[in-house]
C-alpha cells in the first residue's frame, strides 16, 4: 500500500467512526426528549407530586420482609400505569422508570442494631512465630531447603542476559 492509500483509508475510517458517534448521540438525545415529554404529559394530568415518586417508601421496621411485585406500593404504581399507549409505542426504552420488582430482606441479627454500614466490631490479633504450629506429619515427604542450593539458583538466574538483535 502506498502512503496516499493509507491516508485515504484512514480518513474514511475516521469519518465513519465520527458519523457513528454522532448517530449514537442523536439517538440518545431523542430518547431523552421523548422520555422527558412523557413525564411532562403525566405532570399535566396529575399535579400531585406524592404520586410521582420513583422510589418505594422506606420502612424503618427491620423485620419487614418485602416480596416480589410492586403491588405493595399502590401509590407508586398508579403513575407508572398511566402512560399513554402512544408514548409506550414511541419510547419503549422509557420503561426504566418502573419500580424494581424485587426487594432484599434485611438481616435479622440484633447484634448490629446500632452499627451502620453493615459492619460489626472486628477484632484483630497479631500472629507471632510461636503461635503458628505446623503439623510435622503432613510435610514428611518434603525435603528441607538447602541454603547452598538456593544461592546457586540465584546465581544461575542472575547470570542470564537478555539478547537483543537488530530489527
Swiss-Prot record:
Record localization: Membrane
UniProt keywords, alphabetically: Membrane, Phosphoprotein, Transmembrane, Transmembrane helix
Chain positions with Phosphoserine modification: 40
Primary residence: membrane
Cited InterPro entries: FAM163, FAM163B
GO cellular component terms given for this protein: membrane
Entry keyword Membrane: yes
Membrane topology: Single-pass membrane protein
Domain of life: Eukaryota
Segments crossing the lipid bilayer: 6-26
Pfam family of the protein (one): FAM163
Protein family (similarity comment): Belongs to the FAM163 family.
Protein name stated in the entry: Protein FAM163B
Organism for this UniProt entry: Mus musculus
Encoding gene, per UniProt annotation: Fam163b
Amino acid at each position: 500500500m502506498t502512503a496516499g492509500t493509507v491516508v485515504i483509508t484512514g480518513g474514511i475510517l475516521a469519518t465513519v467512526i465520527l458519523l457513528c458517534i454522532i448517530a449514537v448521540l442523536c439517538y440518545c438525545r431523542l430518547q431523552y426528549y421523548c422520555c422527558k415529554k412523557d413525564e411532562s404529559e403525566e405532570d399535566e394530568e396529575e399535579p400531585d407530586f406524592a404520586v410521582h415518586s420513583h422510589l418505594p417508601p422506606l420502612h424503618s421496621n427491620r423485620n419487614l420482609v418485602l416480596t416480589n411485585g410492586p403491588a405493595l406500593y399502590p401509590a407508586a404504581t398508579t403513575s407508572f400505569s398511566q402512560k399513554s399507549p402512544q408514548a409506550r409505542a414511541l419510547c419503549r426504552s422509557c420503561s426504566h422508570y418502573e419500580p424494581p420488582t424485587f426487594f432484599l430482606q434485611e438481616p435479622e441479627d440484633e447484634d448490629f442494631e446500632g452499627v451502620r454500614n453493615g459492619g460489626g466490631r472486628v477484632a484483630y490479633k497479631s500472629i507471632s512465630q510461636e503461635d503458628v504450629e505446623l503439623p510435622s506429619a503432613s510435610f514428611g515427604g518434603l525435603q528441607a531447603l538447602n541454603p547452598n542450593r538456593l544461592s546457586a539458583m540465584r546465581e544461575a538466574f542472575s547470570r542470564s542476559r537478555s539478547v537483543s538483535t537488530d530489527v
